[in-house]
Amino acid sequence: MAIIKCKPTSPGRRHAIKVVNPSLYKGKPISSLIRKNSKSGGRNNCGRITTRHIGGRHKRFYRIIDFKRNKDNIPAIVERLEYDPNRSSNIALILYSDGDRRYILASKGLMVGSKIVSGFNAEIKIGNALPMKNIPIGTVIHNVEIKPGKGGQIARSAGTYVQLISRENSYVTIRLRSGETRKLESKCRATIGEVGNSESMLRVLGKAGASRWRGIRPTVRGTAMNPVDHPHGGGEGRNFGKHPVSPWGLQTKGKKTRKNKRTEKFIIRHRHK
C-alpha cells in the first residue's frame, strides 16, 4: 500500500493524495458475481428528488459480497484481491475446494494464497469466520452479525473493527470504534481481524470533479441562499440568527433521529456518552 502525493502540474492535482495498492487485480470482476447497479439520481419512482446532492457518477457494477460466510468446513484459498467501487474496503475473491467462488471483504493481512475457512470450530486466524461464542475474549473482529444468519452488518468499512470484551449466558458484549458498547447474541457470526485498506481515510480527492465521478453533487449552504429557498437565507452578513434547521424548517444539527427504542436494551453505553 503506497500513499502518493501528486505533483502540482494543475490546480486539481496540487492537493490530491492517492492510495495505491499494487497487489490489486487489474482485470474485470467475475461475471457471475456482479449485477446491474442502476443510478437513481436521488429521485424516487415519481421522479421527485428525495435525497439531495446525488447525481452523475461513473457507471459501475455491484459486486455480490458474501457477508453471511455460511459455507462451513470447506477450506478456501484467496485467488486475488480486487478494487470495489461500491465500498471503501477492498474485496477478495476466494475459491472453495468444491469449485465455488465468492467475494468477501479483504481483511488486513489477507494475501493472495491465504487459506481461510468458516465454521463453528474454525481456527482463530485472520479471515476465518465463526460464531462469537467460540471466539476468545479480547479478539478483534469485523463483519459482525446483528441477527444470527442475516449476514454481517457491523464493521464493514475500510480500517474498522470491533472488540469482543465479555461473554455472559447466550449474549456477548462488543465495543465499537465509535465508543458504543452493546450486547449481541453469541450465535451471531463474525470474521477474525480488522477490515483492510485503512489508508483510504488519507485519500484527498483534490478537485470537485473527483466528487462528481463518485456521484456527489455540490452542497450549497443555506446562508448562501435567498429567503425564498432556505430558512437561513437572506440578511446582511453570514449570521442567520436562529437555531439550525433543514430547508423544510425541521430542527437539525443535534436532533436525535433514532426511532427503534425497542432495541435500546441491548445498548450498554451509547456512542455519544
Swiss-Prot record:
The keyword rRNA-binding applies. Residues 221-263 are annotated as: Disordered. One of its GO terms (biological process) is cytoplasmic translation. Residues 253-263 have a biased composition (Basic residues). Pfam families: Ribosomal_L2 (PF00181), Ribosomal_L2_C (PF03947). GO terms for molecular function: rRNA binding; structural constituent of ribosome; transferase activity. GO terms for cellular component: large ribosomal subunit. Keywords: Ribonucleoprotein, Ribosomal protein, RNA-binding, rRNA-binding. InterPro entries: NA-bd_OB-fold, Rib_uL2_dom2, Ribosomal_uL2, Ribosomal_uL2_bac/org-type, Ribosomal_uL2_C, Ribosomal_uL2_CS, Ribosomal_uL2_dom3, Ribosomal_uL2_RNA-bd_dom. The keyword Ribonucleoprotein applies. PANTHER family: LARGE RIBOSOMAL SUBUNIT PROTEIN UL2M, RIBOSOMAL PROTEIN L2. Belongs to the universal ribosomal protein uL2 family. Part of the 50S ribosomal subunit. Forms a bridge to the 30S subunit in the 70S ribosome. One of the primary rRNA binding proteins. Required for association of the 30S and 50S subunits to form the 70S ribosome, for tRNA binding and peptide bond formation. It has been suggested to have peptidyltransferase activity; this is somewhat controversial. Makes several contacts with the 16S rRNA in the 70S ribosome. This is Large ribosomal subunit protein uL2. It comes from Buchnera aphidicola subsp. Baizongia pistaciae (strain Bp). The lineage of its organism: Bacteria, Pseudomonadati, Pseudomonadota, Gammaproteobacteria, Enterobacterales. The gene is rplB.
